[in-house]
Amino acid sequence: MARDAGVAHLRSSDTVLAALIESVGPLGDSRTGRPDRDDDYGALVRTIAGQQLSVAAARTIYGRLTARFEDRPPTPQEILADEPEELRAAAGLSRAKVSYLRSLAEHVISGELELERLDELGDEQVVAELVAVKGLGLWSAQMFLMFHLERPDVLPVGDLGIRRAMERAYRLPELPDPDTMDAIAQPWRPHRTLACRYLWRSLANEPG
């Protein structure tokens, strides 16, 4: 099993991470509660809805959003057809996030963002495609890579949870900067995504 091989690699390559893995225990299914693997648009909608929120708040907001559309992710056409203020109030979204959802829908409908191509692209190319959409920054693109496309070797150096978990696990004097994080994570390659899941889990704060 791919995860077993990844865990074995992480355990053997980093004694600090090995101890953390032992402490955290088995991980759950990263796809639980998420849009289907073939629903790229739904996954991006979920990512936007959860930006800059706690894990619990993100799940609540996304649940309210899908409840407005028969408990499923909305289509691009449905987002654009909905009245923005009504959507904002019903789901508890900020006005900025409503504008981001509309921008995403417009990019998909116009063909500027070809979701069906993303699986064929490398990680950096996927990021470049996504950050061209208003409201989708590097962090959002990396979450999409990790949790939807299930790319195995992603390290989101801007994620506060990962920084806090590294600071605690490695007994750092302060939150690590990107260079420090890259250096710590080098031995984890090509399983940095899996390592990050353990780091999040150590804080009980895996994005959901």
Predicted regions and their residues:
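C-terminal accessory module of base-excision DNA glycosylases/AP lyases that mediates lesion recognition
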Residues: M1-T32, V98-S99, E112, D119, ...
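Short amphipathic alpha-helical segments
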Residues: A18, G42, R46, A58-Y62
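Residues at secondary-structure transition points
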Residues: D36-D40, A56, P74, R95, ...
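Alpha-helical scaffold segments that form or flank carboxylate-/histidine-based iron centers
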Residues: D36-Q52
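A general alpha-helix detector
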Residues: A43-I48, R64, E83-E86, Q125-E129, ...
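Alpha-helical ds-nucleic-acid-binding substructure associated with the helix-hairpin-helix region
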Residues: L53-K134
